[in-house]
């Protein structure tokens, strides 16, 4: 299968054919993680509703939770106004981060919220 041509024509990819994917938790709106996708990963994600990403380090596609069981069921996919980022609204099972935390954005606060 191939990504719907109407969707593919709206995507802006980097030199490697990749674009940013943000996984956001359904219900809370919490940002869980950021990863890379290509057209194949987005097509697979949309067909299966299982979040599929591109690993730059391994040079291959991976389905979130395929080995760990920490899956992301995708409820919706949105394209941002520039066409270079997709937002996945997901139901997360287990931790989203490879470190074992719920989100990849809970460990290192660079600027604390104002009081």
Swiss-Prot record:
Task: Spell out the protein name for this chain.
Answer: Phosphoribosyl-AMP cyclohydrolase
Q: Which residues are involved in binding Mg(2+)?
A: 80, 82, 84
Q: Which GO terms describe its molecular function?
A: magnesium ion binding; phosphoribosyl-AMP cyclohydrolase activity; zinc ion binding
Give compartment(s).
Cytoplasm
User: What Enzyme Commission number(s) apply to this enzyme?
Assistant: 3.5.4.19
Which keywords describe this protein according to UniProt?
Amino-acid biosynthesis, Cytoplasm, Histidine biosynthesis, Hydrolase, Magnesium, Metal-binding, Zinc
Q: How does it assemble?
A: Homodimer.
Which InterPro entries has this protein been placed in? PRA-CH, PRib_AMP_CycHydrolase_dom, PRib_AMP_CycHydrolase_sf
Protein's job: Catalyzes the hydrolysis of the adenine ring of phosphoribosyl-AMP.
Q: What does it catalyze? A: 1-(5-phospho-beta-D-ribosyl)-5'-AMP + H2O = 1-(5-phospho-beta-D-ribosyl)-5-[(5-phospho-beta-D-ribosylamino)methylideneamino]imidazole-4-carboxamide
> Which residues are listed for Zn(2+) binding in this entry?
81, 97, 104
Give the pathway annotation. Amino-acid biosynthesis; L-histidine biosynthesis; L-histidine from 5-phospho-alpha-D-ribose 1-diphosphate: step 3/9
**What organism does this protein naturally occur in?**
Mycobacterium sp. (strain JLS)
Q: Does the keyword Amino-acid biosynthesis apply?
A: yes
GO cellular-component term (any): cytoplasm
Question: Taxonomy-wise, where does this protein's organism fall, top ranks first?
Answer: Bacteria, Bacillati, Actinomycetota, Actinomycetes, Mycobacteriales
- Protein family according to the UniProt entry: Belongs to the PRA-CH family.
Instruction: Name the coenzymes or cofactors required.
Output: Mg(2+); Zn(2+)
Among the GO biological process terms of this entry, one is:
L-histidine biosynthetic process
Gene3D superfamilies given in the database record: Phosphoribosyl-AMP cyclohydrolase
Cofactor binding description: Binds 1 Mg(2+) ion per subunit. Binds 1 zinc ion per subunit.
């Amino acid at each position: 299968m191939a990504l719907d041509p109407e969707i593919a024509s709206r995507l802006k990819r980097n030199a490697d054919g990749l674009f940013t994917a943000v996984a956001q938790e359904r219900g809370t709106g919490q940002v869980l993680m950021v990863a890379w996708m290509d057209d194949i990963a987005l097509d697979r994600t949309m067909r299966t509703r299982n979040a599929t990403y591109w690993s730059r380090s391994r040079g291959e596609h991976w389905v979130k939770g395929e080995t760990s069981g920490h899956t992301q069921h995708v409820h919706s996919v949105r394209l941002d106004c520039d066409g270079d980022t997709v937002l996945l609204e997901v139901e997360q099972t287990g931790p989203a981060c490879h470190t074992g935390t719920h989100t990849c954005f809970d460990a290192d606060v660079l600027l604390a919220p104002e009081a």
